[in-house]
Amino acid sequence: MLVYLAEYLTQFYTGFNVFSYVTFRAILALLTALMFSLWWGPKLIERLQVLQIGQVVRNDGPESHFSKRGTPTMGGLLILAGIFIGVLLWGDLGSRYVWVMLFVLGSFGLIGFIDDYRKVVRKDPKGLIARWKYIFQSLAALVVAFYLFYSTKHPGETQLVVPFFKDILPQLGLMFIVLTYFTIVGASNAVNLTDGLDGLAIMPTVMVAAAFALIAYLSGHVQFANYLHIPYLPGSGELVIVCTAIVGAGLGFLWFNTYPAQVFMGDVGSLSLGAALGTIAVLVRQEILLVIMGGVFVMETLSVILQVGSYKLRGQRIFRMAPIHHHYELKGWPEPRVIVRFWIISLFLVLLGLATLKLR
C-alpha cells in the first residue's frame, strides 16, 4: 500500500525511491509484523483468558501436558494479523502473488478458526468434523490451483524443479493442478500435526519461510535464476515481502509460545501457515525442496501415517504415541529437549535445501 504513496512522493524527494527496493520493504514488513505481534500479544492473551478460550488436552496424552489445559489458544490470530498488516503496508498490491497468498492465509485461517471455535467455545471436542475440514481445505486449494494454472504468464510457472538436476525441468501441464492441490493441503495438515509442543511448529515455519524469501528473491532476478538453473519468475520478488512478514509475525508469536507457552496458535495458525508454505513452494516452483526443508513436518506426518497403518494392518503400534514428538516425550525426554532438537534438525534440513540450489 505505502509503495504507491512512496512512488508518488518520489517526484518531490528522490529519497523515497528506496521503497521501490524489495529488500528494503521486506525488512520493513518483518519489523512491522514482529513489533505488532510483540505489542498486541499480551493484550490478546489477556483477552483470551477473560473469554476462557483455553486449550483442550487429550486425556490419553503425556501426563506432562495436563498442566497445559486451559492455556489460551487461537493465538494464530495474532500471527495472521501481523502478516496481513506487514504485507498490506509494504507489499505491492498490484501483484497477483500477494493476493494469492492473502487468500490462502485468510481461507485456511478461517477453516482453522471454525475448528478452534467449535472446540474451545462450543466445547465440542471433535471441533470441525474431519470430513468437512478436508472438503473446505480442498476447495480453497483447488481455487488456487486452477487460478494459477489458467493465469500462467511465463513457461517457468508450470515447470517442476528437481533438486540436483539442472537440466530436468519438465512441463507439468494439468498435473500442475494435482501437484498444487496436494502440496497446499499436505503442507497445511503437516504443520497442524507438528503443532503439539511449545514452539515446535512455529520455529521450523520461520526457518522455511526465511529460506523461501531468499529463493523468491533469486527467482525474481533473471541473472540469478539463470545462474542457478531455476525458473525465472517475473514479479516473484513480492513473495519476499510475504515470507519476511511470516518470519516477523512468527518470531513475535514465539516470544509468547516458547516453553512454557503463554498461548498456543491453534488450528487457525497451523493450518494457515502450513498452507502458506505450500503455496509459496508452488509459486516459486520448489515443491520438492519443501519436502527437504520442511522435513520435520514430513517426519511428523509420516509417523502418524505409519502408526495408523501399522495398527490397522498388524494390530501393533510402531511408536509409543504419534505424532513422533510425543513418542520421545513418553521415552522420558523433557519437552524442551524434544523441541530444540527438532529445531536443530529443521535448521540442518533448511540449509541442506538451500545447498541444493548450487549442487546441480
UniProtKB/Swiss-Prot annotation:
Protein's cellular compartments: Cell inner membrane
Main location per the UniProt record: membrane
GO biological process: cell division; cell wall organization; peptidoglycan biosynthetic process; regulation of cell shape
InterPro entries on file: Glycosyl_transferase_4, PNAcMuramoyl-5peptid_Trfase, PNAcMuramoyl-5peptid_Trfase_CS
Chain ranges passing through the membrane: 26-46, 74-94, 97-117, 132-152, 168-188, 199-219, 236-256, 263-283, 288-308, 338-358
Cofactors named for this entry: Mg(2+)
Pathway the protein takes part in: Cell wall biogenesis; peptidoglycan biosynthesis
Bilayer topology term: Multi-pass membrane protein
Record flagged with keyword ATP-binding: no
Domain of life: Bacteria
Catalytic activity: UDP-N-acetyl-alpha-D-muramoyl-L-alanyl-gamma-D-glutamyl-meso-2,6-diaminopimeloyl-D-alanyl-D-alanine + di-trans,octa-cis-undecaprenyl phosphate = di-trans,octa-cis-undecaprenyl diphospho-N-acetyl-alpha-D-muramoyl-L-alanyl-D-glutamyl-meso-2,6-diaminopimeloyl-D-alanyl-D-alanine + UMP
Molecular-function GO term, any one: UDP-N-acetylmuramoyl-L-alanyl-D-glutamyl-meso-2,6-diaminopimelyl-D-alanyl-D-alanine:undecaprenyl-phosphate transferase activity
UniProt EC number: 2.7.8.13
One of the record's GO cellular component terms: plasma membrane
Role this protein plays: Catalyzes the initial step of the lipid cycle reactions in the biosynthesis of the cell wall peptidoglycan: transfers peptidoglycan precursor phospho-MurNAc-pentapeptide from UDP-MurNAc-pentapeptide onto the lipid carrier undecaprenyl phosphate, yielding undecaprenyl-pyrophosphoryl-MurNAc-pentapeptide, known as lipid I.
Similarity comment: Belongs to the glycosyltransferase 4 family. MraY subfamily.
Protein name: Phospho-N-acetylmuramoyl-pentapeptide-transferase
